[in-house]
């Protein structure tokens, strides 16, 4: 924890990543798992990040214990990464102001890239605005370019607590406009989504999101 708080996060900030989110699994598969969210302004920033950290003497010193861990006492088991492109309808991260934060990370898989693009269109045209109107507060929406279970899209919502989560989703599901949208030909669940998974996350004390 100390290496992430004192070494990695400041180093990413120096490398141009404005906000670093660090989350622990509250409910979901593969627990215990640590989730880290990094936002970049360009693909060049993504490509240069590793070299920038490697050249950052302050990071190398502050994170020495983590970086120089031995095979008999590793700092982690494995790392899995995904690269996402922000939706046009929400190009920037919306950092929540609330003190108590429960995050829900949701992934929608599709049977084809065409279906995946239709689901993204559905969000862009209708769902994002319905989310906001019914009390669901998005943090980001991303089209997964590189990762597992492709093609898919992933988004994150934030709530003050479980009660707010349940209330927000109930309001969304009951919304007349949403009922109309989800029944439109070409946009029904059967046509655009083949699997939905979610995980609940709590931010680490030092998370910037």
At which residue positions do the language-model features occur?
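Short S/T/G/P-rich N-terminal loop/turn motif that feeds into the first structured element of a domain
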Residues: 1-60, 65-180, 185-209
């Amino acid at each position: 924890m100390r290496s992430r708080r004192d070494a990695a996060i400041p180093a990413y900030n120096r490398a141009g990543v404005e906000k670093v989110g660090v989350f622990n699994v509250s409910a979901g598969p593969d627990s215990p798992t640590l989730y880290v969210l990094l936002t970049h302004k360009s693909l060049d920033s993504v490509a240069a990040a590793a070299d920038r950290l490697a050249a950052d003497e302050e990071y190398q010193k502050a994170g020495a214990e983590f970086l120089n861990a031995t095979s008999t006492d590793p700092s982690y088991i494995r790392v899995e990464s995904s690269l996402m492109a922000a939706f046009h309808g929400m190009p920037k991260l919306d950092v929540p102001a609330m003190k108590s934060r429960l995050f829900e990370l949701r992934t929608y898989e599709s049977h084809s890239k065409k279906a995946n693009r239709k689901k993204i269109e559905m969000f862009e045209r209708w769902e994002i605005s319905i989310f906001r109107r019914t009390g669901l507060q998005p943090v980001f929406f991303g089209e997964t370019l590189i990762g597992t279970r492709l093609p898919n899209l992933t988004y994150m919502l934030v709530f003050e607590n479980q009660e707010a989560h349940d209330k927000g989703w109930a309001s969304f599901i009951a919304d007349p406009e949403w009922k109309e949208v989800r029944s439109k030909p070409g946009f029904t669940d059967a046509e655009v989504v083949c699997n939905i998974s979610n995980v609940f996350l709590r931010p680490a004390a030092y998370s910037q999101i």
